[in-house]
Amino acid sequence: MDQLTNHFHAHVAELNRRVAEIVARENLSGLVIHSGQPHRQFLDDMDYPFKVNPHFKAWLPILDNPHCWLLVNGRDKPQLIFYRPVDFWHKVADLPDEFWTAHVDIKLLTKADKVADLLPKDIVDWAYVGEHLDVAEVLGFKTRNPDAVMSYLHYHRATKTEYELACMRKSNEIAVKGHVAAKNAFYNGGSEFEIQQQYLMATNQGENEVPYGNIIALNRNASILHYTKLENQSPQPRRSFLIDAGANFFGYASDITRTYAFEKNIFSELIEAMDRAQLEIIDTMRPGVKYVDLHLATHQKVAQMLIDFDLATGDREGLIEQGITSVFFPHGLGHMLGLQVHDMGGFLHDERGTHIAAPDAHPFLRCTRTLAANQVLTIEPGLYIIDSLLQGLKQDNRQHQVNWNSVDLLRPFGGIRIEDNVIVHSDKNENMTRDLGLD
């Protein structure tokens, strides 16, 4: 923790530098960052699980306390308005007493609707950053989530501080423990629900604490890209297991995927081929490389796998140009990672907000940035048997390039995805996931 504490000082200094630059450019007095507030379920007296504003947790690891506010201008010590009501119904947040408290001045707020008493008296030149624009309007903010400020913050968020990198190494460490437990549960005959429980226990995080809904998919369910239903019965026969699951540390996410075969067979060989291809793509990551080019190179490798495993005929370029590889690998290679699983700024060319869209042929790619040092990205190639997409191939001449017998053979296994979390350094890549021993 001592090292994290030391890194935090430099982290806050960098965030202050960024804020000072953008508020001066936009003639603002500063930013007022709202942690957020609960959302009430329709016709109910209960709230949905609270999710903190990522711009708020960039400054402070306060993840579960709504109605907090942070005032920053890049010059003065940040001011934290910390919500601590008198409430006998719910657990009230403890008074902050952690390493980060030395870097903020703290004022306590006991009633959420009295925050105006603690905000700057002349709020006109301060910009509100948060979700609740109606609250901001009532409080008198004229500037709310201004595009220039948001683009600047999102663009620079891609460059992680040493504190952020340390947090993400820790979130990977926690997630790897869960993945090992889930793998063992799979081979011991667990159902999707049981595997999920083993994962959560190993990470010591609940379903509302992990950064996204875990994907725990057995057999054909692995062909559903965002499968989040958990079946209580263990399938028979047991063929395959795809797990896409992460963990959270101080608000920073990990996002890891593995695929396993229950027995040695053609599917296990395909997993090994995908694993080699994924590591080869990671080896080519370096500053100056365009993420789009990594994605296109992955399609070359997927095309070769389709040929090698007798799933399709033809040459690699033809399979790519005709969109056949996109049927088997329909999603993007990965995305930026950080405060959010799909971290902001993946399409920004510069701090002014210039947008670079994904190529027309690959609309689901979530990142078009050029790699730079201290960026963190996922690399997650996949190959799936998705009937709704394969049906499109049967409607034209491309059907003759697909070996449907091979497709039928692999259909019960669902699909494959392998995902690691990688830090780009100036002179190397750091595969946080593999460095922790997760094969």
Swiss-Prot record:
Instruction: List residues binding Mn(2+) 1.
Output: 255, 335, 380, 419
- What's the top EC group for this one? hydrolase
Identify one Pfam family in the record. Peptidase_M24
Cofactor(s) of this protein: Mn(2+)
| Entry note: cofactor | Binds 2 manganese ions per subunit.
Tagged with keyword Zinc-finger: no
Q: Which GO terms describe its molecular function?
A: aminopeptidase activity; metal ion binding; metalloexopeptidase activity; phosphoric triester hydrolase activity; proline dipeptidase activity
Recorded protein name is Xaa-Pro dipeptidase
Which species does this protein come from? Shewanella sediminis (strain HAW-EB3)
Q: Which gene encodes it?
A: pepQ
